[in-house]
Amino acid sequence: DVSAAISVADGAIRSIVFFGLGLVALGLYVLFYQATTRFDIHDEIEKDNVAVGVALAGNLIAMGLVVFKAVFGEFVSWQESLAGFITFAIAGFVLLFIIRMLVDIILLPSTRVSDELVKDRNIGVAYIESAVVISASLILVFAI
């Protein structure tokens, strides 16, 4: 049946488009994360700074969960689905940034996360930041 073949092809195209958008969102989040930190992530990872790598990985997992939620659900139309994806991705960027700032202010008031990650290479702080942003993204995914 021709309509069934068209339906399958249309579903495959939608999947490929939203997969690509998810990758773009993750790439943009890495750039956003770099812009909002006080150090160069690439340089620190090249210097074998595991703490920075763990913090980045935790943030990417958190953003990956947000992107999952952004692409999840019933496809209504291109316009509505793309608008929903973009809205949810931007909300994820903002939420994760705010959560990272709150970790600095509330959980580690006597020091800065960036100092602990870069100067002290404190992997414990990297785990704290990762756990908090992943938890916040899970709340966002399941609450909305």
Question: Where are each of the predicted segments found?
Answer:
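Alpha-helical transmembrane segments with an aromatic anchor "belt"
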Residues: 38-54
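Transmembrane helix-loop junctions in multi-pass membrane proteins
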Residues: 1-9, 34-41, 65-80, 139-144
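Interfacial loop-to-transmembrane junctions
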Residues: 112-131
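Membrane-water interface of transmembrane alpha-helices
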Residues: 20-37, 94-109
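A generic, lipid-embedded transmembrane alpha helix
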Residues: 52-71
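Alpha-helical transmembrane segments
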Residues: 6-25, 80-96
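Hydrophobic alpha-helical transmembrane segments of membrane proteins
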Residues: 18, 128-135
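Membrane-proximal helix-loop-helix units in multi-pass membrane proteins
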Residues: 73-78, 101-114
